[in-house]
């Protein structure tokens, strides 16, 4: 008899990139019954959604939903606004133009809603605060604050079913994340990290996401399987 009914449900935010795919794999190793959630939010490149679909199947997600929402009308981020170019990588303490206003708050809110429908008290998100672009909604203090808010805002929390937001990568650098993922059998050539990957998923090689990814493989001392345009 299948033991899936005894597993604990979890909603996994899955973009199809290196971090979120590793997070899904970690959730599976912890024996969670995974429900993957991706977003078509008006991002310039859509190849990450194909990657998300592939990994949802590879890691046996019970369901994979792609929520179609529009953040492109905000006209602020280089990831969604056609009038703003994706910048080349640069080291800076400033929040970059690739920041999408309140994106993780929006994504987590959808995950929260779906988790309540599923009678699920666990959400996984692949944020980390090392080797990242400095987005404020990737910080641990933000995730903890959202968890507090969520446990004041839902029917299931009021009934005693408290939500936990899991951030298994929060204190890992890219090299550590890559090593962890490889130990779990992830084929990183199938992930899409680049902010402006082409339709086939080939990465630009010059944006922040590409540079952090390249550095991660170098520091992990393993071959980078990423297909780069340059």
Curated annotation (Swiss-Prot):
<keyword id="KW-0862">Zinc</keyword>
<dbReference type="GO" id="GO:0005524">
    <property type="term" value="F:ATP binding"/>
</dbReference>
<comment type="similarity">
    <text>Belongs to the QueC family.</text>
</comment>
<keyword id="KW-0436">Ligase</keyword>
<dbReference type="InterPro" id="IPR018317">
    <property type="entry name" value="QueC"/>
</dbReference>
<feature type="binding site">
    <location>
        <position position="194"/>
    </location>
    <ligand>
        <name>Zn(2+)</name>
    </ligand>
</feature>
<feature type="binding site">
    <location>
        <position position="207"/>
    </location>
    <ligand>
        <name>Zn(2+)</name>
    </ligand>
</feature>
<keyword id="KW-0671">Queuosine biosynthesis</keyword>
<dbReference type="GO" id="GO:0008616">
    <property type="term" value="P:queuosine biosynthetic process"/>
</dbReference>
<dbReference type="Pfam" id="PF06508">
    <property type="entry name" value="QueC"/>
</dbReference>
<dbReference type="GO" id="GO:0016879">
    <property type="term" value="F:ligase activity, forming carbon-nitrogen bonds"/>
</dbReference>
<dbReference type="InterPro" id="IPR014729">
    <property type="entry name" value="Rossmann-like_a/b/a_fold"/>
</dbReference>
<feature type="binding site">
    <location>
        <position position="204"/>
    </location>
    <ligand>
        <name>Zn(2+)</name>
    </ligand>
</feature>
<feature type="binding site">
    <location>
        <begin position="14"/>
        <end position="24"/>
    </location>
    <ligand>
        <name>ATP</name>
    </ligand>
</feature>
<keyword id="KW-0547">Nucleotide-binding</keyword>
<protein>
    <recommendedName>
        <fullName>7-cyano-7-deazaguanine synthase</fullName>
        <ecNumber>6.3.4.20</ecNumber>
    </recommendedName>
</protein>
<feature type="binding site">
    <location>
        <position position="210"/>
    </location>
    <ligand>
        <name>Zn(2+)</name>
    </ligand>
</feature>
<keyword id="KW-0067">ATP-binding</keyword>
<comment type="function">
    <text>Catalyzes the ATP-dependent conversion of 7-carboxy-7-deazaguanine (CDG) to 7-cyano-7-deazaguanine (preQ(0)).</text>
</comment>
<keyword id="KW-0479">Metal-binding</keyword>
<dbReference type="GO" id="GO:0008270">
    <property type="term" value="F:zinc ion binding"/>
</dbReference>
<comment type="pathway">
    <text>Purine metabolism; 7-cyano-7-deazaguanine biosynthesis.</text>
</comment>
């Amino acid at each position: 008899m299948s033991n899936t009914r005894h597993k604990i449900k979890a909603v996994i935010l899955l973009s199809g990139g290196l971090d979120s795919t590793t997070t899904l794999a970690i959730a599976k190793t912890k024996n969670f019954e995974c429900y993957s959630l991706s977003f078509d939010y008006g991002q310039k490149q859509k190849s990450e959604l194909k990657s998300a679909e592939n990994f949802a199947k590879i890691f046996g997600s019970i369901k994979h939903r792609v929520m179609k929402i529009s953040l492109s009308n905000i006209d602020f981020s280089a990831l969604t606004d056609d009038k703003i170019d994706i910048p080349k990588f640069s080291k800076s303490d400033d929040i970059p133009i690739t920041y999408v206003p309140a994106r993780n708050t929006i994504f987590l809110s959808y995950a929260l809603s779906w988790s309540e429908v599923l009678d699920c008290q666990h959400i996984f998100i692949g944020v980390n605060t090392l080797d990242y672009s400095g987005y404020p909604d990737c910080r641990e203090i933000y995730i903890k604050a959202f968890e507090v808010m969520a446990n004041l805002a839902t029917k299931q929390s009021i009934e005693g079913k408290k939500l936990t937001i899991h951030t298994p990568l929060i204190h890992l650098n890219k090299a550590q994340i890559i090593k962890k993922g490889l130990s779990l059998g992830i084929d990183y050539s199938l992930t899409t990290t680049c902010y402006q990957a082409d339709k086939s998923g080939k990465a630009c090689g010059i944006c922040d996401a590409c540079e952090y990814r390249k550095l991660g493989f170098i520091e992990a001392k393993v071959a980078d399987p990423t297909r780069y345009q340059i």
